[in-house]
Amino acid sequence: MPALSKSSHGRFLVWRHFVHIGISVLVLLSWSVRTVAQSASQNPQPQPSKTTWQYGGFLDFAYLEDFNDPANRLFRSRGTTFHVNEWDINMAAIYLRKAATESSRWGTELTLQAGKDSEVFGFSATAPNLPGAEWLRHLGPTDISYLAPIGKGLTLQGGIFSSFIGYDSLYAKDNFTYTRPWGADFTPYLMLGVNASYPFNSKFTGTLFVVNGYWHLANANGVPSSGFQLAYTPTSHMTLKQTILYGPHQAETSLEFWRLLSDTILERKADRVTIAFEYHVGTEKVASSTNPRTLWMFSQLPVHWAISRRFSFTVRPEVFWDRNGRTTGFSQTVKANTTTLEYRIPYRQASAILRLEHRIDDSRGPNGGFFNDGAASPGMIGLSPTQNLLAFAVILTFDSKFHF
């Protein structure tokens, strides 16, 4: 029999890896179902009580004043809040949720969304779109989950779920600042696949996941990516998370071309002050004539102070280094600082969140910079190394529950 080529051998190892994962999942599910059946036959359960469902929605709109006054009204290289000098609805969504609990083991999420922030966040600049991506982008977390009665409780989840990578959410209402940091826009906000989470004890929780790729709306190839997260909570005020994502993000799927991303988050929450530190590093060898090894790093240090029940203040310094331009599209180092003043107006199940925010971004590198009001050459918008933004945002939220 002829020897396998390097590429074929790599694919064989990849698929053998995922076959083993699939067999393990089937065995786990079989064990779970058998355990449930035995428990039901030996210990008949009382009539279950009504389950709690959560529903709501939000509307997020803002005006970002860019003092560079770019002719195209764009925040260069960004996937969220990328339109400036105009009023925009950046996100609007409605949702329905039910948590998986011991009394009602099946859970679900359904989220419908629209707005500027749903246009490009899950796509890739270097890979084709997933079939159906134009309507899939209107789905936020949309999944089913099951809490299996194994040990302390194994939670299985499948569908579109919130990413295990990163400190910041796609939805500004869930963040301390209105605009997201650079590292958030170049890592997944959502994932499409399956995951299994298990609490080993009150301090350690482990999660394994298999997803369709780095970006959930991209179709770089037919090989899934996989990863894990370990979460450690030594006290009620401190959390440490380490997450690894590994898989191919280009047409060439040999193992040497797989992308590796490591994300580390340390958060400390006190009564009024929350401090977090995030560092991620990614690397990937690009299949091209020279096969360059690309590298990028990101770090942020947000500090949030709840001045009162309604007022809060946040400052967030950050730095993003894209040595080869693999993620941002340009070889550059970006240093930024964001300062946010927030005021909340609660009313029954609704609330209004008002934010006034300033951010300054400085990009250095042969191809770095931000759009301005000049022209570098006919048909090409000029670039400035520094950008100042002043944002005013209004986020209206509604959240309630019913029992069924």
Residue ranges and their predicted role:
Residues 63-71, 116-122, 164-168, 214-218, ...:
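Gram-negative outer-membrane beta-barrel proteins
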Residues 44-71, 76-213, 222-224, 231-235, ...:
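Outer membrane beta-barrel
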Residues 89-94, 137-144, 190-194, 224-228, ...:
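Hydrophobic, lipid-facing positions within transmembrane beta-strands of outer-membrane proteins
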Residues 2-4, 18, 24-79, 393, ...:
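N-terminal periplasmic/intermembrane-space "pro-region" immediately following the signal or transit peptide
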Residues 202-205, 223, 228-337, 343:
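Detector for outer-membrane/organellar transmembrane beta-barrel domains
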Residues 347-383, 404:
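C-terminal beta-signal and adjacent terminal beta-strands/loops
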Residues 341, 345, 384-404:
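Outer-membrane beta-barrel "beta-signal"
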